[in-house]
């Protein structure tokens, strides 16, 4: 276990360099996650014979990726970043991948901000192409969780979003302090477990949009649990009743998904 506990001391976050451009493992994992999500989406379209053609699907994923990046970055700046006012007054710096002339990529993304960007992109896409948004949302609920696993592995390899201090034998040292590998907990619970739940729900699905609501609820619960092992965000800490910002946002997400589910299930709204 000693090698595992000191893995950060023996691991370089930079995978390789091309013409002086440093390629980080996080970036590689992000690309893998994106491609896997698209491949899984195409697989599920065929498997469940969904009314989505491949051209529309490819176009949709481009729209969604743009929405996710914009939402994730803006969400992080508005919710988590200690320099929010700086970015508001210097908006051109929001997506600046350079720090002091060195390429470091775009750092600081919010999952919950990404969700908002994703939903907006989906609604705009479906309005433009006159498509049913619930079909696309349910497809995303199936195809994203396993891809999400690689995103959290990317966080782990990038040595960020680390866990709270612990004494468990599988903990890893971060700056000389033993901590939970919470990124891997999240990869398992928020990725693999959530996928299993959504996939099984597909075979008992009773209305369009049910899968995305099941995903939202399952992810929120998984994230809420994982936050107990993850170090609270720097500069924010515990926000309310000993809960982190991630837990508060996950609680709001869960309640919202539950209310929408109840309204649709009991025919209080039509879709």
Swiss-Prot record:
User: Which molecular function terms from Gene Ontology are attached?
Assistant: phosphatidylglycerol-prolipoprotein diacylglyceryl transferase activity
What's the protein's topology in the membrane? Multi-pass membrane protein
InterPro entries, A to Z: Lgt
User: Which amino acids does the record list as binding a 1,2-diacyl-sn-glycero-3-phospho-(1'-sn-glycerol)?
Assistant: 152
Q: Which branch of life, at top level?
A: Bacteria
Keyword Transmembrane among record annotations? yes
Q: In which pathway does it act?
A: Protein modification; lipoprotein biosynthesis (diacylglyceryl transfer)
GO CC term (a single one): plasma membrane
Keyword Lipoprotein: yes or no? no
EC category = transferase
EC number, UniProt record: 2.5.1.145
Q: What is one Gene Ontology biological process annotated in the Swiss-Prot or TrEMBL record? A: lipoprotein biosynthetic process
Family, according to the entry, reads as follows:
Belongs to the Lgt family.
According to UniProt, the name of this protein is Phosphatidylglycerol--prolipoprotein diacylglyceryl transferase
* Species: Campylobacter jejuni (strain RM1221)
């Amino acid at each position: 276990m000693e090698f595992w506990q000191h893995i950060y001391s023996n691991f370089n976050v930079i995978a390789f360099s091309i013409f002086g451009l440093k390629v980080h493992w996080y970036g590689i994992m992000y690309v893998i996650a994106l491609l896997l999500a698209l491949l899984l989406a195409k697989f599920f379209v065929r498997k469940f014979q969904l009314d989505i053609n491949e051209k529309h699907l490819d176009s949709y994923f481009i729209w969604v990726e743009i929405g996710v990046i914009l939402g994730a970055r803006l969400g992080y700046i508005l919710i988590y970043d200690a320099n929010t006012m700086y970015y508001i007054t210097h908006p051109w710096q929001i997506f600046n991948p350079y720090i002091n002339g060195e390429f470091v990529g775009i750092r600081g993304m919010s999952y919950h901000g990404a969700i908002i960007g994703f939903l907006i992109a989906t609604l705009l896409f479906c309005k433009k192409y006159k498509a049913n948004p619930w079909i696309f949302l349910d497809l995303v609920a199936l195809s994203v969780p396993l891809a999400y696993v690689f995103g959290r592995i990317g966080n782990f390899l990038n040595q960020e979003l680390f866990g709270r201090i612990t004494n468990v034998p599988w903990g890893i040292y971060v700056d000389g302090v033993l901590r939970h590998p919470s990124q891997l907990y999240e990869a398992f619970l928020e990725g693999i477990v959530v996928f299993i739940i959504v996939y099984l729900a597909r075979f008992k699905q009773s209305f369009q949009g049910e899968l995305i609501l099941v995903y939202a609820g399952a992810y929120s619960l998984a994230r809420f649990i994982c936050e107990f092992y993850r170090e609270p965000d720097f500069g924010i800490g515990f926000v309310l009743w000993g809960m982190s910002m991630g837990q508060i946002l996950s609680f709001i997400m869960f309640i919202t998904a539950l209310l929408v589910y109840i309204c649709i299930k009991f025919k209080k709204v039509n879709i």
